[in-house]
Each structure stands twice: as C-alpha cells, then as structure tokens.
Curated annotation (Swiss-Prot):
It catalyses: Endonucleolytic cleavage at a junction such as a reciprocal single-stranded crossover between two homologous DNA duplexes (Holliday junction). It comes from Wolbachia sp. subsp. Drosophila simulans (strain wRi). This is Crossover junction endodeoxyribonuclease RuvC. GO terms for biological process: DNA recombination; DNA repair. It is found in: Cytoplasm. Keywords: Cytoplasm, DNA damage, DNA recombination, DNA repair, DNA-binding, Endonuclease, Hydrolase, Magnesium, Metal-binding, Nuclease. It is an enzyme of class 3 (hydrolase). Pfam families: RuvC. Mg(2+) 1 binds at residues 8, 141. InterPro entries: RNaseH-like_sf (IPR012337), RNaseH_sf (IPR036397), X-over_junc_endoDNase_RuvC (IPR002176). The RuvA-RuvB-RuvC complex processes Holliday junction (HJ) DNA during genetic recombination and DNA repair. Endonuclease that resolves HJ intermediates. Cleaves cruciform DNA by making single-stranded nicks across the HJ at symmetrical positions within the homologous arms, yielding a 5'-phosphate and a 3'-hydroxyl group; requires a central core of homology in the junction. The consensus cleavage sequence is 5'-(A/T)TT(C/G)-3'. Cleavage occurs on the 3'-side of the TT dinucleotide at the point of strand exchange. GO terms for molecular function: crossover junction DNA endonuclease activity; DNA binding; magnesium ion binding. Homodimer which binds Holliday junction (HJ) DNA. The HJ becomes 2-fold symmetrical on binding to RuvC with unstacked arms; it has a different conformation from HJ DNA in complex with RuvA. In the full resolvosome a probable DNA-RuvA(4)-RuvB(12)-RuvC(2) complex forms which resolves the HJ. Mg(2+) 2 binds at residue 69.
Length: 162
C-alpha cells in the first residue's frame, strides 16, 4: 500500500493530508489537518513549531511519498520570503525523515483536481469531496494539501481518474 503526504506550506497555517492507495488504486483519506502558529511568536519559534509538528505527523502515519505545493512569488516580498522559510522547514522535515519530495505548481494541482488551473478554494474542496468519499474537511489548507496528494497520485500513475 502506498501512503502519500500532501503539504501546503505556510507560516501561519501549513496544511497536511495523508492518503493511501490500495492494490485497486482506490484513494482512502487517512488524516489531515493544519499546523497553526501564533503570529505573536518570532519567526524562528513559528518555524520550529511547523518542523516539530510535521515530524510528528510523518512519524504517526509513515508515508512512503511526499508532495509539496510550490510557492509563487507574491506582490508582497516579505510574505514571499516568510512563505519560503516555511517551505524550507517542510523540505528539511521531509529530508530528515528520508521522504523524497515531489513538487507541483498550484495551477497544475488545481487543473489535475478540478480541470481548471485557476479554480478557487470552494471548487477544490468540492472536487476533493467527490474524489474521496465520506470526507469531512472544512479547512482549505488541509483541502489544498489533500489536492496536492491526489495530484501526486494521478501524476505518478499510482492512480488514475475514473
């Protein structure tokens, strides 16, 4: 059985989701959530929280593969820089836990899930609920991470759209 962790990095909220694929390539949602940090904390403390919490998630679920959403350059350079810090911590956690990272552009993820590279958050949540039955997910960060994991399954040929 293949287990994939999908990640949507962010300094305030890092979304994560774990899926498994059985021998028939059916997707099962194993867990997901958001690692949140307090904006009142210093950057170093926030990054440490992301790192430690992500290591716990990886240890708990033992995924075989990892998929991370690439960052885009924002109009606000400071926001782009702090997003890059969060992404760096995610990459480090994956490296330390010996998971190979696969990266996907946000537009590619959206297109593979919804058919539209410019889909909004509600469309993504709607489609992941169509793909993964009996899913109760409300947070868009976790839904984005789930979309990244599903995109990876589709892209790597582990699974195909029916």
């Amino acid at each position: 059985m293949v287990k994939i962790i999908g990640l949507d990095p962010g300094i305030s909220k890092t979304g994560w989701a774990i899926i498994s694929l059985n021998e028939k390539n059916n997707i099962e949602f194993l867990g997901g959530g958001t690692i949140s940090t307090d904006g009142k904390l210093g950057t170093g403390e926030r990054l440490h929280i992301i790192f430690e919490q992500l290591k716990k998630v990886i240890s708990l679920y033992s995924p075989n593969e990892a998929a991370v959403e690439k960052i885009f350059v924002n109009k606000n350079p400071k926001s782009s820089l702090t997003l890059g810090y969060a992404r760096g911590v995610v990459i480090l956690a994956l490296k330390i836990t010996k998971l190979t990272m696969n990266e996907y552009d946000a537009n590619y993820v959206k297109k593979s899930i919804t058919g539209n590279g410019h889909a909004d958050k509600d469309q993504i949540i709607f489609m992941v609920k169509q793909i993964v039955k009996n899913l109760n997910i409300k947070c868009h960060h976790a839904a984005d991470a789930l979309a990244v994991a599903i995109c990876h399954a589709y892209t790597k040929g582990s699974c195909f759209v029916e």
